[in-house]
Amino acid sequence: MITRNPKIDGSATTVQSLLREMKKSDPQEYRVEGRIQVPDWRGVNNHFQGIAPINGEASITGDISASADRAWVANFLQGTSSPSEVQGVWSTQNYDHAGGIQRLGELLVVPLESDNGATVAFLQGSSYLYEIHQPDGHKASAAAITNYTDSAGVEQALLMVYRYDPKSFDIFRAPADSVSSNTWVRVGGSSEISGREQYQCFALVTQTSTAGVEDTVYLVGLREDEKVVLFSLVTLGSFFGSLAELEQYQFDGSQWRYGVGLQIVSSTSIRIFGCSEDPSGDRDDYHFPLYVWG
């Protein structure tokens, strides 16, 4: 299993520059069609939440999660011609909310909620691999994941699981080559995020260093008001887990309440994916739009 994401080449550009220079209106629109049956999505409280495009790809391919009475995730694939098609669906009746999602190579992390309990499931495609559990009362509303080179030159995988109250993260780490099975260790928590705005999804993006060994890791927050918030993250020393807001960027052209996510296309390119509505049609014959900035 591939467990690596592309890293932004710090000698050529920066995460901050890529977000700052990205066109933030008039996104390209794509269509996704599905004929694999999904759980019922109808109802005022049911909606898409997170989008996890496959990183290192230019095609409209990846996963979308549903916050519904029965949590589910659909895998979509763009073939030689548009539109993209749903190729697989994973669901569980034990959880009622699939939150914000991100991929690490072929590994997809899916936060799931039920009452005050929370679990993070790990999938490969639509196949379940394993899960980890959050402390009691800590709802897992989004999860972000990346790989980075630490100060000792070791490639690590980093997982951040978001909870609403307080607005902060549990942080887990594992050797990057071992996360096809559960080797995660909780290594701490983050500082709190200020403000009342609702985040739909988060993404971790790694930038290579131009001086020294250790990579720089950024957290990108994607809010339902179509605003992107960039945070720096401390991954070393006594301030490990500290977040500092760097910039905010206003986007428009979709409704991120119905799903949003980030894609690392290459070492010099990132894109934002958004949705604007629930699926149209029947449970076994449906379609929905995707909007792409970048």
Describe the function of each predicted region.
Residues 28-42, 81-92, 127-135, 182-193, ...:
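A short beta-strand motif characteristic of beta-propeller blades
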Residues 2-42, 52-92, 122, 126:
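Beta-propeller domains
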Residues 190-257:
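Intrinsically disordered, low-complexity segments enriched in Gly and acidic/Ser/Thr residues
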Residues 47, 74-113:
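Blade-loop segments of beta-propeller domains
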Residues 42-52, 91-102, 135-151, 194-209, ...:
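Repeated scaffold domains used in trafficking and secretory/extracellular systems
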Residues 66-75, 116-122, 156-157, 165-175, ...:
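Structural motif
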Residues 55, 60-64, 105, 111-114, ...:
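Recurrent small/Gly-Pro-centered beta-turn motifs in extracellular repeat architectures
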Residues 55-57, 105-107, 154-157, 213-217, ...:
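Short coil/turn segments that connect the beta-strands within blades of beta-propeller domains
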